[in-house]
Protein backbone atom coordinates (compact mmCIF):
# COMPACT_ATOMS: atom_id res chain seq x y z
CA UNK A 1 0.00 0.00 0.00
CA UNK A 2 2.75 2.36 0.94
CA UNK A 3 4.81 1.33 -2.11
CA UNK A 4 1.94 2.07 -4.46
CA UNK A 5 1.62 5.51 -2.97
CA UNK A 6 5.31 6.17 -3.50
CA UNK A 7 5.09 5.01 -7.11
CA UNK A 8 1.96 6.97 -7.88
CA UNK A 9 1.99 9.24 -10.90
CA UNK A 10 0.32 12.17 -9.15
CA UNK A 11 1.61 15.58 -10.17
CA UNK A 12 3.96 17.39 -7.74
CA UNK A 13 4.20 21.15 -7.37
CA UNK A 14 7.40 22.80 -8.58
CA UNK A 15 8.87 25.46 -6.27
CA UNK A 16 10.06 28.60 -8.02
CA UNK A 17 10.92 32.24 -7.16
CA UNK A 18 7.96 34.44 -7.92
CA UNK A 19 9.94 37.71 -7.65
CA UNK A 20 10.17 39.86 -10.71
CA UNK A 21 13.44 41.41 -11.81
CA UNK A 22 12.58 44.75 -10.16
CA UNK A 23 11.63 43.07 -6.90
CA UNK A 24 14.85 41.06 -6.93
CA UNK A 25 16.80 44.25 -7.54
CA UNK A 26 15.17 45.95 -4.55
CA UNK A 27 15.96 42.96 -2.34
CA UNK A 28 19.59 42.97 -3.45
CA UNK A 29 19.92 46.69 -2.76
CA UNK A 30 18.39 46.23 0.69
CA UNK A 31 20.81 43.42 1.48
CA UNK A 32 23.77 45.50 0.34
CA UNK A 33 22.60 48.43 2.47
CA UNK A 34 22.20 46.22 5.54
CA UNK A 35 25.67 44.80 4.97
CA UNK A 36 27.13 48.29 4.70
CA UNK A 37 25.36 49.42 7.88
CA UNK A 38 26.59 46.39 9.78
CA UNK A 39 30.17 47.36 8.99
CA UNK A 40 29.88 50.92 10.29
CA UNK A 41 31.80 51.42 13.58
CA UNK A 42 29.23 53.86 14.99
CA UNK A 43 26.20 51.69 14.54
CA UNK A 44 24.96 51.25 18.12
CA UNK A 45 26.73 48.02 18.88
CA UNK A 46 26.16 46.14 15.62
CA UNK A 47 29.92 45.90 15.42
CA UNK A 48 32.07 44.88 18.37
CA UNK A 49 34.28 47.48 19.99
CA UNK A 50 37.39 45.65 18.84
CA UNK A 51 36.18 45.72 15.22
CA UNK A 52 35.19 49.36 15.47
CA UNK A 53 38.58 50.27 16.91
CA UNK A 54 40.26 48.38 14.08
CA UNK A 55 38.20 50.29 11.49
CA UNK A 56 39.14 53.56 13.18
CA UNK A 57 42.82 52.70 13.02
CA UNK A 58 43.25 52.02 16.73
CA UNK A 59 44.55 48.51 16.32
CA UNK A 60 45.81 46.73 18.34
CA UNK A 61 43.06 47.22 20.91
CA UNK A 62 41.42 44.86 23.32
CA UNK A 63 39.71 45.10 26.68
CA UNK A 64 42.08 42.42 27.88
CA UNK A 65 44.74 45.15 27.86
CA UNK A 66 42.82 46.95 30.61
CA UNK A 67 43.70 45.15 33.83
CA UNK A 68 40.56 45.72 35.85
CA UNK A 69 41.74 43.15 38.36
CA UNK A 70 42.14 44.78 41.75
CA UNK A 71 45.13 44.30 43.96
CA UNK A 72 43.58 44.65 47.40
CA UNK A 73 45.72 42.38 49.56
CA UNK A 74 47.99 45.11 50.87
CA UNK A 75 47.32 46.38 54.39
CA UNK A 76 49.52 49.13 55.77
CA UNK A 77 49.94 50.03 59.42
CA UNK A 78 51.10 53.30 60.94
CA UNK A 79 51.63 53.89 64.64
CA UNK A 80 52.03 57.31 66.27
CA UNK A 81 52.06 58.78 69.75
CA UNK A 82 50.29 62.14 70.06
CA UNK A 83 51.46 64.87 72.41
CA UNK A 84 49.40 67.67 73.93
CA UNK A 85 49.07 70.99 72.07
CA UNK A 86 50.21 69.49 68.78
CA UNK A 87 49.10 69.75 65.19
CA UNK A 88 50.69 67.11 63.00
CA UNK A 89 50.32 65.89 59.42
CA UNK A 90 51.65 62.68 57.89
CA UNK A 91 51.34 60.96 54.53
CA UNK A 92 49.30 57.78 54.25
CA UNK A 93 51.44 54.73 53.56
CA UNK A 94 50.20 53.36 50.22
CA UNK A 95 53.28 51.47 49.00
CA UNK A 96 53.61 47.81 50.00
CA UNK A 97 56.87 46.33 51.17
CA UNK A 98 59.02 44.59 48.60
CA UNK A 99 57.66 41.13 49.49
CA UNK A 100 54.09 42.37 48.90
CA UNK A 101 54.78 44.07 45.58
CA UNK A 102 52.30 43.00 42.85
CA UNK A 103 53.70 41.47 39.69
CA UNK A 104 51.57 43.83 37.61
CA UNK A 105 51.82 47.61 37.80
CA UNK A 106 48.55 49.31 38.75
CA UNK A 107 48.78 53.11 38.33
CA UNK A 108 45.76 54.01 40.50
CA UNK A 109 44.89 53.28 44.12
CA UNK A 110 42.28 54.05 46.74
CA UNK A 111 41.80 53.44 50.44
CA UNK A 112 39.24 50.65 50.18
CA UNK A 113 38.96 50.46 53.96
CA UNK A 114 40.62 52.13 56.91
CA UNK A 115 40.55 51.72 60.67
CA UNK A 116 41.90 54.16 63.22
CA UNK A 117 42.24 53.33 66.91
CA UNK A 118 42.71 56.14 69.43
CA UNK A 119 43.82 55.06 72.89
CA UNK A 120 43.66 57.95 75.33
CA UNK A 121 45.96 57.66 78.32
CA UNK A 122 44.94 60.83 80.18
CA UNK A 123 41.58 59.85 81.65
CA UNK A 124 40.84 63.24 83.26
CA UNK A 125 41.88 65.41 80.32
CA UNK A 126 39.12 67.62 78.93
CA UNK A 127 40.61 68.33 75.51
CA UNK A 128 39.31 67.50 72.05
CA UNK A 129 41.11 65.93 69.10
CA UNK A 130 40.20 66.48 65.46
CA UNK A 131 41.28 63.84 62.95
CA UNK A 132 41.06 64.50 59.22
CA UNK A 133 41.85 62.51 56.10
CA UNK A 134 42.61 65.11 53.45
CA UNK A 135 43.35 65.21 49.74
CA UNK A 136 45.65 68.15 49.02
CA UNK A 137 44.85 67.94 45.31
CA UNK A 138 41.88 70.26 45.80
CA UNK A 139 42.42 74.01 46.03
CA UNK A 140 39.55 74.75 48.39
CA UNK A 141 40.40 73.74 51.95
CA UNK A 142 36.86 72.50 52.62
CA UNK A 143 36.98 70.26 49.54
CA UNK A 144 40.25 68.74 50.75
CA UNK A 145 38.63 67.05 53.75
CA UNK A 146 37.46 63.52 52.96
CA UNK A 147 36.71 62.42 56.53
CA UNK A 148 36.64 64.47 59.73
CA UNK A 149 36.20 63.12 63.25
CA UNK A 150 36.06 65.12 66.50
CA UNK A 151 36.16 63.40 69.88
CA UNK A 152 37.42 63.83 73.48
CA UNK A 153 41.07 62.90 73.91
CA UNK A 154 40.40 61.00 77.14
CA UNK A 155 38.25 58.38 75.37
CA UNK A 156 39.22 55.14 73.66
CA UNK A 157 37.56 54.89 70.27
CA UNK A 158 37.91 53.53 66.75
CA UNK A 159 36.88 54.89 63.35
CA UNK A 160 36.01 52.63 60.40
CA UNK A 161 35.35 53.77 56.84
CA UNK A 162 36.52 53.89 53.23
CA UNK A 163 37.23 56.36 50.44
CA UNK A 164 35.26 56.08 47.21
CA UNK A 165 37.61 57.79 44.76
CA UNK A 166 40.89 56.58 43.29
CA UNK A 167 44.10 58.57 43.09
CA UNK A 168 47.05 58.21 40.76
CA UNK A 169 50.14 56.73 42.35
CA UNK A 170 52.09 59.79 41.28
CA UNK A 171 49.75 61.89 43.46
CA UNK A 172 50.04 59.73 46.58
CA UNK A 173 51.77 62.52 48.49
CA UNK A 174 48.51 64.49 48.39
CA UNK A 175 46.66 61.95 50.56
CA UNK A 176 47.43 62.88 54.17
CA UNK A 177 46.16 62.65 57.72
CA UNK A 178 45.89 65.72 59.93
CA UNK A 179 45.79 65.40 63.72
CA UNK A 180 45.12 68.43 65.89
CA UNK A 181 44.65 68.60 69.66
CA UNK A 182 42.89 71.38 71.57
CA UNK A 183 43.53 70.98 75.28
CA UNK A 184 44.54 73.17 78.19
CA UNK A 185 44.19 70.60 80.98
CA UNK A 186 47.50 68.77 80.31
CA UNK A 187 50.92 69.83 79.09
CA UNK A 188 54.32 68.43 78.12
CA UNK A 189 53.13 64.83 77.86
CA UNK A 190 51.92 62.14 75.49
CA UNK A 191 48.13 61.97 75.58
CA UNK A 192 47.39 58.99 73.33
CA UNK A 193 48.61 56.26 71.06
CA UNK A 194 47.04 56.05 67.60
CA UNK A 195 47.03 53.05 65.26
CA UNK A 196 46.15 53.47 61.59
CA UNK A 197 45.34 50.55 59.29
CA UNK A 198 44.89 51.07 55.55
CA UNK A 199 43.48 48.55 53.10
CA UNK A 200 44.90 49.66 49.76
CA UNK A 201 43.19 48.69 46.51
CA UNK A 202 44.96 49.13 43.16
CA UNK A 203 43.66 49.07 39.61
CA UNK A 204 44.16 50.65 36.19
CA UNK A 205 40.43 51.29 35.69
CA UNK A 206 39.79 53.95 38.38
CA UNK A 207 35.98 53.99 38.41
CA UNK A 208 34.80 55.45 41.71
CA UNK A 209 32.93 53.25 44.14
CA UNK A 210 29.76 53.97 46.08
CA UNK A 211 30.38 55.85 49.29
CA UNK A 212 30.00 54.04 52.60
CA UNK A 213 29.22 55.63 55.93
CA UNK A 214 32.06 56.20 58.34
CA UNK A 215 31.19 54.81 61.77
CA UNK A 216 32.77 54.94 65.20
CA UNK A 217 33.05 52.61 68.17
CA UNK A 218 33.89 53.59 71.71
CA UNK A 219 35.88 51.13 73.80
CA UNK A 220 34.65 50.41 77.29
CA UNK A 221 37.18 50.06 80.13
CA UNK A 222 38.27 46.49 80.69
CA UNK A 223 37.73 44.73 83.97
CA UNK A 224 40.84 44.71 86.13
CA UNK A 225 40.66 41.36 87.87
CA UNK A 226 43.26 38.63 88.23
CA UNK A 227 45.61 40.90 86.37
CA UNK A 228 48.63 39.02 87.72
CA UNK A 229 47.69 35.88 85.79
CA UNK A 230 48.78 35.57 82.17
CA UNK A 231 45.61 33.62 81.36
CA UNK A 232 43.60 36.83 81.74
CA UNK A 233 45.20 38.14 78.54
CA UNK A 234 44.25 35.12 76.42
CA UNK A 235 41.09 36.77 75.04
CA UNK A 236 42.19 40.37 75.42
CA UNK A 237 41.67 41.39 71.77
CA UNK A 238 38.39 39.49 71.48
CA UNK A 239 37.01 41.16 74.59
CA UNK A 240 37.96 44.62 73.36
CA UNK A 241 36.37 44.08 69.94
CA UNK A 242 33.17 42.63 71.38
CA UNK A 243 32.76 45.54 73.74
CA UNK A 244 33.41 48.04 70.95
CA UNK A 245 31.22 46.56 68.23
CA UNK A 246 28.22 46.65 70.51
CA UNK A 247 27.52 50.33 69.89
CA UNK A 248 28.36 51.81 66.51
CA UNK A 249 27.53 55.49 66.11
CA UNK A 250 28.22 58.50 63.91
CA UNK A 251 27.54 61.27 66.42
CA UNK A 252 27.50 61.61 70.17
CA UNK A 253 27.02 64.39 72.69
CA UNK A 254 29.07 65.23 75.78
CA UNK A 255 27.26 68.03 77.64
CA UNK A 256 29.89 68.04 80.36
CA UNK A 257 32.53 69.10 77.83
CA UNK A 258 30.80 71.49 75.44
CA UNK A 259 27.13 71.46 74.49
CA UNK A 260 27.72 73.51 71.33
CA UNK A 261 30.18 71.13 69.73
CA UNK A 262 29.32 68.08 67.66
CA UNK A 263 31.28 64.95 68.51
CA UNK A 264 31.75 61.95 66.28
CA UNK A 265 31.91 61.84 62.48
CA UNK A 266 31.69 65.46 61.40
CA UNK A 267 32.22 64.93 57.65
CA UNK A 268 31.64 61.89 55.46
CA UNK A 269 33.16 61.04 52.07
CA UNK A 270 30.97 62.42 49.31
CA UNK A 271 30.96 63.22 45.62
CA UNK A 272 29.43 66.06 43.65
CA UNK A 273 26.05 64.76 42.42
CA UNK A 274 25.36 64.55 38.71
CA UNK A 275 22.65 67.10 37.91
CA UNK A 276 19.98 66.19 35.39
CA UNK A 277 18.84 68.74 32.84
CA UNK A 278 15.30 69.96 33.20
CA UNK A 279 12.74 69.45 30.45
CA UNK A 280 12.85 73.14 29.52
CA UNK A 281 16.62 73.02 29.02
CA UNK A 282 16.31 69.89 26.91
CA UNK A 283 13.63 71.46 24.71
CA UNK A 284 15.75 74.57 24.16
CA UNK A 285 18.77 72.48 23.15
CA UNK A 286 16.67 70.33 20.86
Swiss-Prot record:
Paired cysteines (S-S): none
Keywords from the UniProt entry: RNA-binding, Transport, Viral movement protein
UniProt key word Lyase: no
Coiled-coil segments on the chain, per record: none
Listed InterPro entries: Tenui_NS4
Molecular function per GO: RNA binding
Any one GO biological process: transport of virus in host, cell to cell
Keyword Protein transport appears in the UniProt entry: no
Entry similarity comment: Belongs to the tenuiviruses pc4 protein family.
Role according to the record: Transports viral genome to neighboring plant cells directly through plasmosdesmata, without any budding. The movement protein allows efficient cell to cell propagation, by bypassing the host cell wall barrier.
Protein name, per record: Movement protein
Amino acid sequence: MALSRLLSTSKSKVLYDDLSEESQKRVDNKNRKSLALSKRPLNQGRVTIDQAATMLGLEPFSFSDVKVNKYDMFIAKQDYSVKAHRRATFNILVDPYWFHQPLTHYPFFRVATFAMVWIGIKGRASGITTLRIIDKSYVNSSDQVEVEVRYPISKNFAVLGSLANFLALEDKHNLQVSVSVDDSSVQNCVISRTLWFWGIERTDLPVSMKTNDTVMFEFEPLEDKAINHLSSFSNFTTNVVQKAVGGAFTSKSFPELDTEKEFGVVKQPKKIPITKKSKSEVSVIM
